[in-house]
């Protein structure tokens, strides 16, 4: 969809539809009051009649409003004016897009970006409107033989800002919002792919494809033979039961001549059966989403390719498949990781940390400024935080604060969990340096504690996205998270300013 920004009076807009807000109880927004004046009280008469209360998400579509050049006016309920926050703002944008898409309005001018949202500026409102609109219109229907097609879908949406000074800010917000939502789309498309198609080799092909389309990105793919030469035995153990070869794709974005790189490491288990410690059948189909970390890294690199910030970033897609087989690794095995540390396997379904620990050792060679790993790592994180926030752990307070700040700015929430030394005691082994699972108590934290043993040489953070990477049930599918958080973090690091 095409987006634009302008600053003008609502009654003078020649458009298929203009969108304005109404507050609860039956109170016109400032822009709606302008329309009411030029229409001799037409809107206020409708409200007095009880046609719209103004509750969040209510919609009323009007045709041929007197004194207004637009063909239609869409009144949108925004709840109580003083309570309009970022969550409600996204809800009303989502409902607005859905309604416009069904009205036959192929283009519209939206004045909702002039509403006051607590603690948010014009840049935030326009960018979030773009991201929300794009995500609302997302479909994954590649494998459907009969695709649903709207007769006259929404093609163009223009956001109005209060002053002409905000036009350049709005244009930058649209550019950022489009890049992030395009990155989210790539993330969602790859994650939603069925596991018979999205294998480690498929992940590698997508990494190469992005490099082919962007002069700032190069991709190198490392297969099992080279992994063996590097001593990545923990990573390889996970892949032993699968006929699909493990592949690690290393993508380098070069936007600065000599800055130290920030490294993003994405867990890429394209299917996780649990291995010998096999998972229950119910819900196992969703284990195709166990590569959500790698998908989010690919999506973030896609956003970087569009935004071209002056920063160096390395994205690693750690692709593998965890399957049961006569060659599969077993509970009781002891593995020697690339770092030389030994790991006693208690559960083959705690495999993501075995893949990641070797990749975290591998990336030492880049002498990174900081490393962030992203993984659908533990069900325990879902129990702790649900689907609203990703779990964050770090060995470096400033890095953790940067990521939390990026989560607030982007609306892609994260919550920090502790990594106290006491948790390390849960992963001690009588036979090796550590075990690969610390049991049920604090399971998300002990997984982070395990990874922390491989990150002594750099500043590191871990994002557990098991609760945020995908949805189940009627809305089943990838969410595209945490692409907004990661992209915002990198934009902040690159010093990208919002105002010109």
Swiss-Prot record:
Amino-acid biosynthesis in keyword set: no
Query: GO: which molecular function terms?
Result: manganese ion binding; metalloaminopeptidase activity
One Pfam entry for this protein is Peptidase_M17_N
Instruction: State the EC number(s).
Output: 3.4.11.1, 3.4.11.10
Task: Provide the cofactor note recorded for this chain's UniProt entry.
Answer: Binds 2 manganese ions per subunit.
Active-site residues, record numbering mapped to chain = 279, 353
Describe the task this protein carries out.
Presumably involved in the processing and regular turnover of intracellular proteins. Catalyzes the removal of unsubstituted N-terminal amino acids from various peptides.
Q: How is this protein named in the record?
A: Probable cytosol aminopeptidase
Source organism of this protein record: Tolumonas auensis (strain DSM 9187 / NBRC 110442 / TA 4)
């Amino acid at each position: 969809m095409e987006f634009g920004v302008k600053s003008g009076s609502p009654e003078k807009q020649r458009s298929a539809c203009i969108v304005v807000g109404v507050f609860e109880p039956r109170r016109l927004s400032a822009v709606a009051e302008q329309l009411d004046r030029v229409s001799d009280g037409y809107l206020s008469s409708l409200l007095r009649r009880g046609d719209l209360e103004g509750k969040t998400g209510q919609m009323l579509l009007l045709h041929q409003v007197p004194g207004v050049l637009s063909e239609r006016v869409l009144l949108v309920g925004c709840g109580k004016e003083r309570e309009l926050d970022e969550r409600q703002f996204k809800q009303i944008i989502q409902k607005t897009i859905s309604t416009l898409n069904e009205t036959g309005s192929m283009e519209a001018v939206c004045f909702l970006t002039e509403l006051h949202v607590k603690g948010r500026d014009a840049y935030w409102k326009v960018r979030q409107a773009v991201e929300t609109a794009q995500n609302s219109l997302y479909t994954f229907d590649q494998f459907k033989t009969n695709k649903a097609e709207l007769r006259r879908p929404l093609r163009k949406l223009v956001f109005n800002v209060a002053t002409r000074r905000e036009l350049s800010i709005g244009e930058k917000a649209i550019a950022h919002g489009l890049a992030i939502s395009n990155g989210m789309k790539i993330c969602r498309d790859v994650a939603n792919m069925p596991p018979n198609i999205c294998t480690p080799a498929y992940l590698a092909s997508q990494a190469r494809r992005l490099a082919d389309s962007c002069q700032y990105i190069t991709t190198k793919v490392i297969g099992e033979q080279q992994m063996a030469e590097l001593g990545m035995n923990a990573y390889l153990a996970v892949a032993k039961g699968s006929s699909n070869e493990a592949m690690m794709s290393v993508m380098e974005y070069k936007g600065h001549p000599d800055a130290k790189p920030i490294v993003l490491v994405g867990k890429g288990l394209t299917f996780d059966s649990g291995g010998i410690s096999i998972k229950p059948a119910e819900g196992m189909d969703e284990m195709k989403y166990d590569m959500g970390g790698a998908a989010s890294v690919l999506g973030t690199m896609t956003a970087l390719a569009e935004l071209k910030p002056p920063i160096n970033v390395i994205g690693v897609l750690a692709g593998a498949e965890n399957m049961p087989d006569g060659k599969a690794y077993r509970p009781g095995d002891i593995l020697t990781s690339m770092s030389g540390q030994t790991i006693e396997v208690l559960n083959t379904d705690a495999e993501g940390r075995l893949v990641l620990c070797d990749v975290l050792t591998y990336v030492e060679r880049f002498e990174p400024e900081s490393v962030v790993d992203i993984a659908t790592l533990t069900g325990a994180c879902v129990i702790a935080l649900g689907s609203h926030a990703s779990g964050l752990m770090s060995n470096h307070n400033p890095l953790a604060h940067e990521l939390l700040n990026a989560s607030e700015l982007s609306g892609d929430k994260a919550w920090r969990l502790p990594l106290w030394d006491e948790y390390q005691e849960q992963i001690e082994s009588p036979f090796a340096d550590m075990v690969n699972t610390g049991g049920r108590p604090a399971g998300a934290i002990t997984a982070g504690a395990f990874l922390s043993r491989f990150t002594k040489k750099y500043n590191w953070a871990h994002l557990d996205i098991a609760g945020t990477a995908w949805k189940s049930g009627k809305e089943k599918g990838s969410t595209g998270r945490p692409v907004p958080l990661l992209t915002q973090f990198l934009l902040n690091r690159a010093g990208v300013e919002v105002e010109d």
